[in-house]
């Protein structure tokens, strides 16, 4: 249904599908992975009753900024994507979209996102510049460092402090526990993603934590996930979250255990499935937060 709706945009313009693929709107997994921790922060910052305005601003902001990040990512990778089996048919790599068109779409999406942020307050507006900087820098990091996933984690977590300042204008120290938790979680699941392309990346000189971790990859990922849960547990104690929240964390831990077990053969398909599976972990934690506030 969702994909059919997107494909129907071709009736409006013959190249619409190319830009849908460029912004990765046809693959919403990235939206989910960014949305759940952001909504967790929105809910906690709003003490379980966030304003509808803030929910809409951050939900739409997630969709727009994730799309913007995909545009600039493909722009940065346009000369290497053609050498990787999974990415060879992307719009920029295949020549269906021009580099300047990708940059223009990136700017448009960032501009619309900024209009949303203007509906909050000055502190949140200033923080939003950090979000743009991280989104722009991340795609280029894989050329220079084995830690591009850390930069992605910082970018994917930036909505958390923004959610708190948007709710009350102040940023409590405990909010950074949520930030660190999400950064660690992001590094973990994006390492699974990088493991899919590891052989190709080694050939073309692209760096990643999957290459850095080597044979210890799954153990390190599980360690990062457990550390993330530890930070979430501490944050929950600081924000007086109880049983339902802890149940959500326990369910997420079960997801992480399944990912560790399912990737024991290190084949591409299982690593990609493990990456996708993190959507459920994020959703379960969010449900735990919502229920914990709603059932008090």
Curated annotation (Swiss-Prot):
Subcellular location per the Swiss-Prot or TrEMBL entry: Cell inner membrane
Membrane topology per record: Multi-pass membrane protein
InterPro entries hit by this protein: HB_polyprenyltransferase-like, Prenyltransferase, UbiA_prenyltransferase, UbiA_sf
Catalytic reaction(s) noted: all-trans-octaprenyl diphosphate + 4-hydroxybenzoate = 4-hydroxy-3-(all-trans-octaprenyl)benzoate + diphosphate
Gene3D superfamilies membership: UbiA prenyltransferase
GO CC annotations, alphabetized: plasma membrane
Coiled-coil residues: none
GO BP, sorted A to Z: ubiquinone biosynthetic process
Domain of life (superkingdom): Bacteria
EC number of this enzyme: 2.5.1.39
Pathway: Cofactor biosynthesis; ubiquinone biosynthesis
Primary location: membrane
Top-level EC class: transferase
Pfam assignment, any one: UbiA
Record keywords: Cell inner membrane, Cell membrane, Magnesium, Membrane, Transferase, Transmembrane, Transmembrane helix, Ubiquinone biosynthesis
Required co-factors: Mg(2+)
Role of this protein: Catalyzes the prenylation of para-hydroxybenzoate (PHB) with an all-trans polyprenyl group. Mediates the second step in the final reaction sequence of ubiquinone-8 (UQ-8) biosynthesis, which is the condensation of the polyisoprenoid side chain with PHB, generating the first membrane-bound Q intermediate 3-octaprenyl-4-hydroxybenzoate.
Protein name: 4-hydroxybenzoate octaprenyltransferase
Source organism per UniProt: Pseudomonas entomophila (strain L48)
């Amino acid at each position: 249904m969702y994909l059919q709706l997107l494909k129907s945009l071709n009736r409006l313009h013959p190249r619409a599908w190319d830009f849908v693929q460029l912004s990765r709107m046809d693959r919403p997994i990235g939206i989910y992975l960014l949305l759940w921790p952001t909504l967790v922060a929105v809910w906690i910052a709003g003490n379980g009753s966030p304003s509808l305005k803030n929910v809409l601003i951050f939900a739409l902001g997630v969709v727009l900024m994730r799309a913007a990040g995909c545009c600039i990512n493909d722009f940065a990778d346009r000369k290497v994507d053609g050498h990787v089996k999974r990415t060879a048919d992307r719009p920029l790599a295949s020549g269906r979209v021009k580099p300047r068109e990708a940059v223009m779409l990136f700017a448009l999406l960032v501009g619309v996102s900024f209009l949303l942020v203007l509906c909050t307050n000055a502190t949140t507006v200033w923080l939003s510049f950090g979000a743009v900087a991280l989104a722009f820098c991340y795609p280029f990091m894989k050329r220079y460092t084995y830690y591009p996933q850390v930069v992605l984690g910082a970018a994917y977590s930036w909505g958390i402090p923004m959610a708190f300042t948007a709710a009350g204008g102040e940023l409590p120290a405990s909010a950074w526990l949520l930030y660190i938790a999400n950064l660690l979680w992001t590094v973990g699941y994006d390492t699974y993603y990088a493991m899919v392309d590891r052989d190709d990346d080694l050939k073309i000189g692209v760096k990643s934590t999957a290459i850095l971790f080597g044979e210890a990859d799954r153990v390190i990922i599980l360690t990062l996930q457990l550390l993330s849960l530890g930070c979430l547990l501490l944050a929950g104690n600081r924000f007086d979250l109880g049983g339902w929240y802890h149940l959500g964390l326990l369910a997420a831990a079960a997801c992480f255990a399944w990912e560790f077990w399912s990737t024991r053969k290190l084949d591409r398909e299982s690593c990609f499935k493990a990456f996708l599976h993190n959507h459920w972990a994020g959703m379960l934690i969010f449900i735990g937060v919502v229920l914990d506030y709603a059932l008090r």
